Amino acid sequence: LHDALPILGIALGLAVMIIAVSVIVGFKSEVRDKIVGFGAHIQIGNLDAARSYETRPVVVGDSMMAALSDYPEVKHVQRYSTKPGMIKTADAFQGMVLKGVGQEYDSTFFHRHLLEGEFPQFSDSASSNRVVISKSLANKLQLKLGDKIDTYFIQDDVRARRLKIVGIYQTNFSEYDNLFLLTDLYLVNRLNNWEPDQVSGVELEIRDYDKLEETTYEIAADTDENPDRYGAEYCVRNVEQLNPQIFAWLGILDVNIWVILILMIGVAGFTMVSGLLIIII
């Protein structure tokens, strides 16, 4: 039994280290994947739009989309537009952001988290008045699949749109679940009074996350100094620049991993030395 104590101590320490590191790494990966799922790895928008969802447009034509797709690390490119507004029911109201996407939108993330209904192929040339809403918003407003909701948007005047819920998703990432509804790009552009080739921005998915910073700077170097035909300047930012607080918090978890590793190595070393002393004595 005494001979087995050092081995058991080391084995226990290794098991705890592996479990702790796996849990933290898995958690970080899950959070990162959900942030990327809502907004891709890199976004190109209007430099003057800051970080508001009430964005100023940039012109993104087919030639720019093709040029962005030619970067080796870029896997997918998609246009989007956003419009802050409010949902009002008979008993409650809730602020939200309506995000418009088109046929090119990669809906894999939302299909993976879809609870009810469908995620339709939205359009940039017509409005179907369909919307996909989160489970948390549906619960707050007592809405269900197939319901029609009244949405209101403030421009120079108040605009109202009645939209039909065709899908309900749940990512359990409340910061975004409580915010985003998805619909046709065409509808959001109409609400913003924009031209057909004007959008809030472009989302880019990349092949290798480890090359995020390198790819961001490469695209920014080619894009930032080339304004569109209205003089709007492009701004390239990646997911870590758009969400600094969340990624700073995730970075702190790396410190926790090292603390756990050091403690477990210390415990394993102490156990091994103690076991050897017991055997010798």
Predicted region positions:
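Peri-transmembrane interface segments
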Residues: 4, 212-218, 222-270, 279
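Short, strongly hydrophobic transmembrane alpha-helices
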Residues: 4-26, 37
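Membrane-embedded alpha-helices of multi-pass transport/permease systems
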Residues: 16, 21-24, 28, 269-281
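Membrane-interface junction motifs in transport/secretion proteins
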Residues: 28-62
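Hydrophobic C-terminal alpha-helix "anchor/cap" residues
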Residues: 35, 67-72, 219, 223
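A short beta-strand structural signal in non-transmembrane regions
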Residues: 42, 138, 197-220, 235
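Structural beta->alpha junctions
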Residues: 48-54, 170-172, 204-213, 240-243
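A structural signal for hydrophobic secondary-structure junctions
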Residues: 57-58, 62-197
